[in-house]
Design a protein with these regions (language model features):
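Short acidic/glycine-rich loops and adjacent helix/strand connectors
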Residues: 1-320
Length: 320
């Protein structure tokens, strides 16, 4: 049976092809369209995927009605997330199955890790209603241990600070991470903590809580900081606080699991400057090479099949 996993209509669209339980192909739309971080599918990637045959089943990386409800509650207005209608634009038909956004992330990481048991940690900007989730992987099962709602999203906050520095949110966070090396992290860290984050020192039932709803960004914060060095210092403080919060989340994870294996997923797993911290708390670490929404094209399928696969390596996409 040919199964397609799809992550699209969001950012970094991707498509994965499974023949039975074997991953045959996974690629991002941008490789075919040449549009950086392309959010949509295109005829080229679809035609390439069809070389393995038309899909009998299609697996979508998130649950559309939950996403629409959250957008409505957050004041974004009603946004249509009709998957069937979206796929019809590309002449894609087949039985459509959906899964929750964070479960797709968790499945993409755990079932490719090679671990038979692991703590799975997903940190991103937002997925339906959640921004942080912790899972216990045991054998072929993934059990949700904890989740944190999007109003307390460390990923959304990092994206808001990316925008505050004049960069494109949900795309140019890597630039902010690089800018941090040029700034003084101590100049603004205290002010930033005071203005944004409530972090009770001993409350490990609540790893973090934000004072502001960052859905609409934080352009209002410290409008007096406009020079290039100011922006470097904002970046440095942001990165330093992110690393503080990551350590707090890792410490919190250890209260939920005794595993020494960690699977780290979600867009925040791309913060390579901070990832060294995970080895302070876990012995073995797997970060799937596409931990963001692109990798959820694979995870959408694995969340349903619930089977470990032989990870074929990173060269499973576009033929160079």
């Amino acid at each position: 049976m040919i199964r397609w996993g799809i992550s699209a209509n969001n950012h970094n669209a991707a498509l994965a092809v499974f023949d039975g339980d074997v991953l045959k192909f996974a690629g991002e739309s941008e490789r075919f369209s040449k549009i950086k971080n392309d959010s949509d599918l295109n005829s080229q990637i679809i035609d390439y995927a069809r070389s393995w045959g038309d899909p009998s089943e299609i697996y979508w990386f998130e649950t559309p009605y939950k996403k629409s409800l959250r957008q409505l509650i957050a004041g974004q207005g009603f946004v249509s997330n009709n998957v069937k209608k979206y796929l019809q634009k590309y002449n894609i038909s087949g039985k459509i199955k959906t899964t929750d956004h964070h479960r797709s992330h968790a499945a993409a990481g755990y079932y490719t890790s090679g671990y038979q048991e692991a703590c799975v940690l997903v940190i991103d900007a937002i997925g339906e209603f959640h921004s942080l989730s912790m899972w216990q992987g045991q054998g072929d099962q993934l059990e949700l241990l904890y989740n944190l709602d999007y109003r307390n999203s460390v990923g959304l906050w990092y994206s808001a600070m990316t925008q505050r520095c004049g960069l494109k949110p949900i795309e140019e966070e890597y630039i902010l991470m690089g800018m941090a090396a040029l700034g003084n992290p101590n100049r603004l860290t205290r002010d930033m903590l005071d203005d944004f984050i409530y972090m009770p020192i001993d409350d490990y039932n609540n790893p973090l809580q934000f004072k502001e709803n960052l859905h609409r960004g934080c352009q209002w914060w410290r409008p007096d900081l406009t020079s290039q060095q100011d922006l470097y210092d904002i970046a440095a403080a942001t990165q330093q606080i992110y690393e503080m919060l990551l350590e707090r989340i890792l410490q919190f994870a250890l209260t939920k699991t005794s595993s020494r294996n960690l699977v780290l997923m979600g867009g925040c797993a791309l913060n390579c400057a901070a990832n060294h911290l995970v080895y302070k708390y876990f012995q073995n670490v797997w970060i799937m090479p596409a931990p963001g929404d692109n990798g959820s094209a694979i995870g959408a399928v694995l969340a349903h099949t619930k089977k470990h696969i032989n990870w074929p390596g990173v060269y499973i996409g576009y033929d160079m």
